[in-house]
Design a protein with these regions (language model features):
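Short beta-strand elements
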Residues: 276-294
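Glycoside hydrolase catalytic-domain context in secreted enzymes
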Residues: 1, 5-253, 260-270, 274, ...
Length: 544
C-alpha cells in the first residue's frame, strides 16, 4: 500500500517496501502484488521477480469495495476493468517531468500573502507552471512518439491506457463503417472465446492525417467506447458504436484559431488498448472543414476560439514536427523564473486595486429592484440570449447580489426578488459530506475506480446514488464530479478525477451528472482545469 497524501505522493518503492518485496519473494513462489494507490506508479520491479505472477490495481474502493478483492482472487468475480491512465517504467522520461509543479516568480516575492493550507499557516507567492506538452498528455504522447520512432515503446510503457486482463479471452470483429447525417456507426461483434463468463470493453480510436509542422495531432485518440454485458463462454454480443465526424477535428491555435477537420484519410480502429489494434477501417474526408464563426460544430454552443493568449508565455511547446525534434528544448526545466513586462506591472496594478480609478461621471447605475414580475423558475430552459434575463437581473437588489457572492460556500443564498430559495451544496466526489454538521454518507469508490470500469451505465448508477443520498440529506447541490485531467502522476487530486483522457473522463462525468439529476440534484463539475494540487490552487483559481 502506498502511503501518501496531498502533500506527499511517491511514484516508486521506498527502501522499506523493496525489502518487503524481497522477503516475500524469497519465501513464496506465487506472489500477487496489490497496488492500492490512485496515481500511476512505477511497477517495473514486478518484471524483475519470477515469483510475481500478477499485479492487481485496486485504488480507493470506499467503505466496502475491498470485500470484492477476495472474490476476484478466488475466481468468483472475473475482472473487466481497464486502465484510465498510462503506466510507464520511468517517470523521469515523461514530457511533464521538469514542469510538473509550481515555480515561484523570483521578482514577485514582495507580492506573497499569508494563508492557510490543510489547517496550517502557509505563505503563497505568485507562481507558474508550464504546460509544455500541449496536447501530448498520457497515451497521446507515447503512442505518437512510438509511431514517429522517437521512443522504444516496449521499454517505455509497461501498461498502456485502456489495458486490463481477464480470466477469459475475447474476440472482436469490426463491421463496415456507416455514415449518416454526420455520424459514423460501426458494429463490433464481441465473442467470449474462453471458458469463464466475463465482460469486455470495445475501445474505438482514430488516427487523423498529419502534415509535418502542421496542426498538432496525436496518432491515437479514443473517440468512443462501450462495455459489453456479462458474456457466457461461447456467447456473442454485437455492440454498435456511434460518434460524430466533427469529433475528429483538431484545434488549430496558430492559423485558423478554430477546430479544423482536415481532408485526408482517418484510420478508425478497434483496440485492445491504446497500443494494440485489433482491426481498422479508413474514413476519408474529401474537403477540409473549418469550424469557425457561424459554422460551429454542432456540439458547441459557440465556435471555439483562442483565449488566454497572454498566458502562452515565451516558452517552447512540444511539437510532433520532425519526429519531436524539439523535445529536449520543450521539456527542459524553465531557464528563468522571472516574470517579464508588461505582466509584472499589471500584477502590481491589479494587486493594488483602487475602485475610484474606475469611476466615470457618465456611468449610469444599473437598474436594481425593478418589479418586472419574473421568477427564476420562469427562466427554466431559457436560451442564454433570451431578453428576459436582463429583466430578471434588473429585479435584483444590491444587497441580494452581495449576499449571493458572500454566502456562496456550500450553499447559495435566497433572492426573494426573483423567487429564488436558499439551497445547500455538499462535498464531494467519493462521499456526501456536510462540512457544517459533520453528517456524511458512506464512502464510495473514488473516481479513478469508476473510470477503470469503462462502464457508462455504472457511472450513471453512481451518480444516482450520490443524488439520492444528497436528497435524503437535504442537499440540492453536489460538489462533484471532479473533472480535471491526470496530467502527471503526482496530481494530488488525481483520485478525485477520472483519467488522463478527456473522452473517457467526459463520458463518465456526464453520466454521473445525469444520474444525480434524476433526484433533482445539480452538479458542480469542479476543478475543471489547472488544479494538480493544493500548492497550485491559487494559480488555478481565476480560471476554475
Amino acid at each position: 500500500s502506498l502511503v501518501g497524501s496531498e502533500m506527499c505522493i511517491r511514484d516508486r518503492l521506498s527502501q522499506t517496501e523493496k525489502d518487503m518485496v524481497d522477503m516475500v519473494c524469497d519465501n513464496f513462489d506465487d506472489v500477487i502484488v496489490i497496488y492500492n494507490g490512485a496515481n500511476q506508479f512505477e511497477l517495473g520491479f514486478t518484471d524483475e521477480y519470477p515469483q510475481i505472477k500478477s499485479v492487481v490495481w485496486c485504488p480507493g474502493t470506499g467503505n466496502v469495495g475491498f470485500n470484492a478483492l477476495g472474490k476476484v482472487f478466488s475466481g468468483e468475480v472475473n475482472p473487466s476493468g481497464k486502465t484510465p491512465d498510462t503506466f510507464i517504467y520511468d517517470m523521469t522520461t515523461a514530457p511533464w517531468w521538469n514542469n510538473g509543479e509550481k515555480i515561484e516568480y523570483t521578482n514577485l516575492a514582495d507580492m506573497a500573502v499569508e494563508g492557510m493550507n490543510a489547517g496550517s499557516p502557509q505563505v503563497y507567492a505568485p507562481a507558474f507552471t508550464n504546460y509544455v506538452e500541449g496536447i501530448y498528455v498520457g497515451y497521446k504522447y507515447y503512442e505518437t512518439a512510438a509511431q514517429e520512432g522517437f521512443i522504444d515503446y516496449d521499454k517505455t510503457v509497461q501498461y498502456p491506457f485502456g489495458y486490463g486482463l481477464s480470466y477469459t479471452e475475447f474476440e472482436q470483429k469490426m463491421g463496415e463503417l456507416e455514415e449518416k447525417d454526420g455520424q459514423i456507426s460501426v458494429d463490433v461483434e464481441v465473442t467470449n472465446t474462453g471458458d469463464v463468463a466475463g465482460k469486455d470493453v470495445v475501445e474505438v480510436y482514430y488516427n487523423p492525417p498529419y502534415t509535418n509542422g502542421g496542426i498538432e495531432k496525436a496518432s491515437a485518440n479514443l473517440i468512443e467506447f462501450a462495455k459489453t454485458d456479462l458474456l457466457q463462454p461461447g456467447d456473442s454480443q454485437t455492440v454498435t458504436v456511434t460518434f460524430d465526424v466533427e469529433d475528429m477535428a483538431s484545434y488549430d491555435e496558430n492559423d485558423a484559431e478554430a477546430y479544423v477537420l482536415e481532408k485526408g484519410d482517418y484510420v478508425i480502429s478497434i483496440n485492445r488498448d491504446s497500443h494494440t489494434v485489433l482491426d481498422q477501417k479508413t474514413y476519408t474526408v474529401d474537403d477540409t472543414v473549418v469550424y469557425a464563426g457561424e459554422n460551429k460544430r454542432a456540439s458547441d454552443d459557440t465556435a471555439a476560439v483562442n483565449v488566454f493568449e497572454d498566458a502562452k508565455g515565451d516558452i517552447t511547446y512540444l511539437s510532433r514536427a520532425d519526429h519531436f525534434a524539439n523535445y529536449e528544448e520543450a521539456t527542459a526545466a524553465p531557464a528563468s523564473a522571472e516574470l517579464g513586462e508588461p505582466y509584472v506591472s499589471e500584477y502590481h496594478l491589479n494587486s493594488n486595486f483602487d475602485k475610484t480609478t474606475y469611476l466615470n461621471d457618465e456611468d449610469v447605475m444599473p437598474t436594481t429592484g425593478a418589479d418586472n414580475g419574473l421568477t427564476l423558475a420562469d427562466m427554466r430552459d431559457a436560451d442564454y440570449d433570451d431578453p428576459r434575463w436582463e429583466k430578471l437581473l434588473d429585479q435584483l437588489t444590491v444587497d441580494e447580489m452581495a449576499n449571493m457572492i458572500a454566502m456562496a460556500g456550500y450553499q447559495t443564498a435566497a433572492m426573494d426578488s426573483v423567487g429564488k430559495v436558499a439551497t445547500l451544496d455538499f462535498d464531494g466526489p467519493a462521499a456526501i459530506n456536510n462540512n457544517f454538521t459533520g453528517v456524511g454518507s458512506i464512502g464510495f469508490p473514488i473516481e479513478v475506480v469508476i473510470a477503470s470500469t469503462w462502464n457508462k451505465e455504472l457511472a450513471q448508477t453512481w451518480g444516482e446514488c450520490m443524488g439520492k443520498i444528497s436528497q435524503e440529506m437535504g442537499a440540492e447541490g453536489w460538489y462533484a464530479p471532479g473533472m480535471n485531467t491526470h496530467r502527471t502522476a503526482f496530481g494530488a487530486r488525481n483520485y478525485e478525477y477520472f483519467s488522463e483522457d478527456g473522452v473517457l473522463a467526459g463520458n463518465m462525468g456526464a453520466n454521473a451528472v445525469e444520474g444525480a439529476r434524476k433526484y433533482g440534484v445539480y452538479s458542480y463539475i469542479k476543478h475543471f482545469a489547472l488544479y494538480e494540487g493544493l500548492s497550485l490552487i491559487h494559480i488555478s483559481e481565476p480560471t476554475r
